[in-house]
Each structure stands twice: as C-alpha cells, then as structure tokens.
C-alpha cells in the first residue's frame, strides 16, 4: 500500500466536513444533538458506549512487518496480523468515511519536549474527539502550523469488521501499524481504546531511547519528592495519587528519563463506580462541564447521577483535563522518583497491606505484575480473577518484560529509590469472606512510605513470600499489618497463601533469561 499518511492527507482530510481542534463547547453541542449525549446536573457530558464498555484485548493486533518483528514479544496479547489484512481494512475505512463529517484533534503525547510525539486523532464521533482533546496534550499557539503527526489514530466505531472476510477476531478491531505509523480502530465506541493504543505505541518506542515507559500515576510533595504508583485498572492508582497534600503529575502513563518523570497525557481517565465526594473529592470536583462520563446511570429529567448503579458496567469512567484537578502539576513533569508503590488488589487476602522490597524483589514483582482482575474493566470479567500482567500493564507492553524490568532495576539502583508492595485488596479472608482493605488505612501506609516514616521501623519476614512487613505504621492498627493474624482460621490462610505462592512460581517459569538473584525471589511453597 502507498503511504497511509499521504492517503489520509490527500483523501480523508480533503473533504469539506472536517473539523480541526473544535472548541469543547462545540463538540459537546454536537454530541448532545447528534450522538445521544446528555448533560448531567454537574455539567458533565454523559455518553453510553453501547455493548462495548471496556477494552477488547482479544481484538488488538500489531502488523507483523520487518521493522518490528524481532523486537515485539509476540504472545496471545501481542498478536500479529498481516499487512494485507490491515490494507484491506484501511481501504474499507477510506470508503466508510467518504462524505462523512469528521473531527480531528492535533496535539501531543508526552509533556517532556525531548520525548513528546505529535499525534493526530480522527473521529467520526464528536464525543470521542472531545475525549482525545481532553486526554492528550493540547497544542499551544503556533504549534499547529506545519503540523506533522508522527502517529495517527483513525477511530471509526460504526465501521464493523466481518471476521470471516477481514481476518479479525470479531467485529471489533484495534490494529497498530508501526511501519505506516497509524492505529486503526473499528467496531467499538469505548474511548479507552484510543488512549491505550497511543500508550502502547509510546511503550514500544521509548525504551530504544533509554526511557522507561510506565503504567503508573505520579505525584509530588511540597519538598519536591516524587512518588510513582503502579497498578492495573481498579487497584487504586488514580485514587491514591489524588492526595490533597501532594500535587498530581498524572494519573496513568509516564516516562522516566535521566532528568525525572513526565506525564504522557494532558488528562485523566478515572473509574467512578461508587464514587463519593467524601472518599475522592479531587475526582468528584473534576467531573464538571467539559468532562465526559461513560456508561453511568443518569436521570434524564433531573440530571442526577447514580454512581453506585452498575447496570451498564462496573467500568464507569470519567475523562477530564488534568487542570480540573486542584493543584495539579500542569507542566506534567517531576524529578527523579524517591518512592515507588506497586499496587495489587489481592483477592485471596494473603498478601500484606504493605511490604518493603529490595531491588531484586522490585524487578520480580514488576515482571510478575500480580493482581486480581476486577469486574468490568474487560469484557467477560464478572468476579475477581487472579492474573499476572507483566510490568503492571502487560497488554500495553510490546517489548520483552525483561527490557522494562532491566531499565527499572538500573534506575532504582542508580537513584536509591525505595519500593513498596501495597495490597489494596482483601484482608481477613478471600473475596466473599474477608473485606476490602480500608482506604483510610491504605492512604496512611502510603503516606508513611513516601515520607520515609517506614525507613526506621522494625520489619518481620513473611515465611512464604519472603516480604518485609513493617511491625508498626502511623495511623494503622498493628493487627492489620500482618495478614495471617486477620484470618479466623490459620489453616485456611496457609492453604490460600500456598496456592498463591504456587501461582507466582508457575507464572515466573515463562521468564527464562533472568538472573538467579531475581529467580530466587520466588515464594517458598510449604
């Protein structure tokens, strides 16, 4: 196929119905008038994305061509597809958009000028273009003159594939083509596919520049100390990094350079199931005019939102620009991280609520990426399921996990960054018997870790997972810190702990070319 960018420039972008970087007001107006959008009492635009309310990982492909073939860690998550399949779908896309009204966002991903990437997002829905405008970094005056995107996203929810003809998995497709520098999305109205596709592109490109891309949130204290929060969807990244005593750098995607960390994005995409003003005031207050709410339940007569209602999905989302968060770091940058927090939502209830990690343990747990998949974040998940997602973001990491872990280990060692594993999941028993760890306790533990208050306390070793558990922590009951003591039945605890330990050991077998120092972190099954 000819250069896709040239085809887009000479074809799609030459029609009369193209809107470039429309103001928020206009996009909202179109979404309400033509796309079923409803304005809530708080001013946010409410959109229902239909049957696809989460990512469709089975439908994501990477075009397998020479420039990427030897670099990508091909697996069931990183599935290859031929250039021919892509070309055929792109031709369908060109026919699909003929004479359509289209919305184009031109801006950037990456707040560090040395590493930012100019992107173009082309949408057939105004609300998705509003999403792109609020999620990515808007251009400043003059930055769109002679704009030359390095990557283009073409998102066409109404273009559905025919698997038998098109070689896809279903009617939905998300295809990354690095040779043509384009992401082609069809069949799904879930806006998160746009965001995560560009994240995946950055995760592929940056390690070649000695930058560690990270699925994490980041914040900074008044004294300049930076903290990173890693974790899969629903583990508490957004919630825990929204701290009134610290400034938010970003809530989901960052890069770590020799100079510090930078946010990839200009917005936030927060889960809002069971959202309350009391528990999460920063997120609550950010949901206002200009924000988008996906798949929440709204009373169309009163405009009242019921954040507790999950009739469409548990994966309800709010998208808003980072400046809607009070005291956010609008330049999106911070210094070298002082503290790293790995978040896991352990549904077995056996991991400690907080444990301090060595460099080798940090690399091990980073590569393992253990959590329990929570309902609604992907299609088909209705109860928590144990899962291992490398680098706490497996679906978005295209290179070998060892590549990212090596970069992390080097940076931890070079800058003496402290690392903690924090369990935001269950305590006192597994899911269904125990209870979710209280948010106020988790906040206190995280605060103590960041302030260095856990550097001087005594630690005990967990006999199975070999984790260092603090014996005390400010504002946290002592009995909460040691998980075995929160269970009524010690034998049941031992059984569950050994089951999870076996899962860790089994999962880590897939990493063959790692040092013994890291392999030896494996739990000791008893």
From Swiss-Prot:
Record: residues binding substrate: 55, 190, 196, 317
Protein name from the UniProt record: Phosphoenolpyruvate carboxykinase (ATP)
PANTHER family tied to this protein: PHOSPHOENOLPYRUVATE CARBOXYKINASE (ATP), PHOSPHOENOLPYRUVATE CARBOXYKINASE ATP
Binding residue positions for ATP: 196, 215, 231-239, 280, 317, 442
Catalytic activities: oxaloacetate + ATP = phosphoenolpyruvate + ADP + CO2
Source species of the chain: Alkaliphilus oremlandii (strain OhILAs) (Clostridium oremlandii (strain OhILAs))
Superkingdom as given in the UniProt entry: Bacteria
Cofactor(s) the protein needs: Mn(2+)
UniProt entry tagged with the keyword Membrane: no
PROSITE patterns linked: PEPCK_ATP (PS00532)
